[in-house]
Amino acid sequence: MAVLYGSQTGNAEEVAEDLHRQIERMARRKEINVDATSVSAMNDFDPATLPLQKFVVFVTSTTGQGDPPDNMKAFWRFLLRRSLPLRTSLALTNFAVFGLGDSSYPKYNVVARKLYRRLEDLGGNPLVGLTSSLGDDQNPNGGYFAALDLWTDQLFHKLREACGGIGNGGHEPTAGAIDVDESKIVVERAERPEARASQFDLSKEIALCHRVLRATLGNQGQASAHAPVDSGDSDGGSKERPFFAQLRGNEMLTAPSHAQDVRAVSFDLHPRMCYSPGDVLGILPSQRGDLVAEFLARIGAREDEWVRLRCRKDGGSSGTSQDVIHLGTLFTHCLDCTSAAPRKYFFQIASFFTGVEDAMEREKLAELGSREGRDDLHQYCTRERRSLLECLQDFPSVSLPLEWVIQLCPKLQPRLFSISSACRDASEAENDRQSDRGAPIGGGVRCELTVAVVRYKTPWKREIEGLCSNYLRDLGVGSSVPVWVESGTLDFDHLLGPQPEESSASLGGEREACAILIGPGTGIAPFKSLVEHLVSAAEGGERARTMKILVFFGCRSRGKDYLHRSFWEECVRGSEIFASPGGFAAAFSRDQRGEVLTRASDGSVESRALGRAPAVDLPSYSTTNKFYVQDAIDACSKEVYDVMHLRRGSVYVAGSTGQMPRDVRAALAKVMVRHHGMGESEADEYIRRMEATKRYQVEAWG
């Protein structure tokens, strides 16, 4: 039996690991009869052996525009091969799929749905129906766990029936009933290697820590265990061997009196680290040194210690690692001990490592690690964002061995930021009249991000700071930051490629290189990159006269958080792509108004005030007097109709998940009702067709 996962941030991996542990316990207790079980990322499993598996359990999330996670993509491509015979390839294989999704996203659980149907097409026999296999983060009764608990009960019941075992009704053991596992690794203290005694190369030490973790603990949400570590010489770097970029600028974009600090953070990249509009910059943040030192003291370790990790028999990877790693590097750059909340398994294991006199702590830990304590765990850990350090402080009797600390500590996840500048080398930046930051130092490539510094209070009024945004906020010019370039989820190819010779304004005609860009707050970042590129590329050419770009930006107040205001005003003044029906519209929610800037035929900028429609004509999605981007779309509906329908332009939306993408979609559908005479269902279907042909794309984040 195999348990396989596709996981981008670690949640699907955690579910898969937990399922595997429960299945192994069932096998040890003779509740089911299986020869062997395994758990791995899908990319680390040989798909050609899938027909040999009697039972396979899949757990997957959905990323981007309905894309599979990185550690599932190769496996998924194999399953899509046309050479695989339908209805017979997996005729002897029983499968179950569980999807981790969020119904506030347009592509809710689409990867799990596609995987389920493809396995069925290949002849696989489903153990649990599709409708019971979809978890939703938006479920008020425990998020995706509400569906996972019921799905697990059904799965285990089917396994007992198929494998001839008898058990406890398919329920996870209650609090205190879980037997302790052996750790996957053994940790040995070591001396600092002589070869590294004279020079400490942080980039190499980080790469080595990642390699050792993969070799001993398996994939753990990082790159494939079988993939070579990047040398650092590739154009964009990599997660395991990032390029250390120099911080060039760290400028506050918002007024000091504004509630949120938003910054323009710029870097000098390697000369070969080119990027395109829509790409993202991956950043590996460092944890605060004082908190890491506090954590190491709590577990009885020191920052300057060196250790050797090896696999325990039958645990982790089949090989062993003899590489010695630095504990300070491991817990500062690779494992997240000060920000991410530990998983349920931490509490299960921690309950076995309390003092004999601390029965209350032991019972509470066991409860938090059980199904019965899942709601308490959600409140204590997830909603309150308690880190591993804080959990250990709350339970002072816990004394975990170092091997368990390393195994249970969440992996430090890189953060991805949309790049908000166009790619320019030193000579281009020097001559760019729009650049107020000059050329990169040393002939590199300039890269700018628009970063909102995350600070908020939990339901219990605890102050929380986002790890990466606050890390960037505190950096001084000249600091080195580990980064790499990745492709984003927004596809701008038809805007960046050659203009079609002929275009049709009919519904069925070829779309023109026109677009509507909707980016409230820092969602404007990828569109600033795109516009900066287009303005430069189209300047003085025929394309500038035929391409039309209509931008919608939203913020709270014109005088406090109008991000990159001078850039947008200069672009409208200097480029014909902002001539009508193009333009730049800004909605100021707390000012309860907006404005739209358009380039006039004489090169001047025309400004038109935007306000809410009369109360009798309030859009259905407007419930307050605030003026949002959807209200600006409503006020500019004629221009929106021209670009979106008559010119068959594309629509791109970026920003926070939740209500905004839904309200924007409703506003665009209303445009078709108003100007094309469609009914509401017709307009909804029109937007759906745009989504299917990638004319409507959404990049949203929580």
Report the location of each language-model feature:
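FNR-like FAD-binding dehydrogenase module
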Residues: 1-702
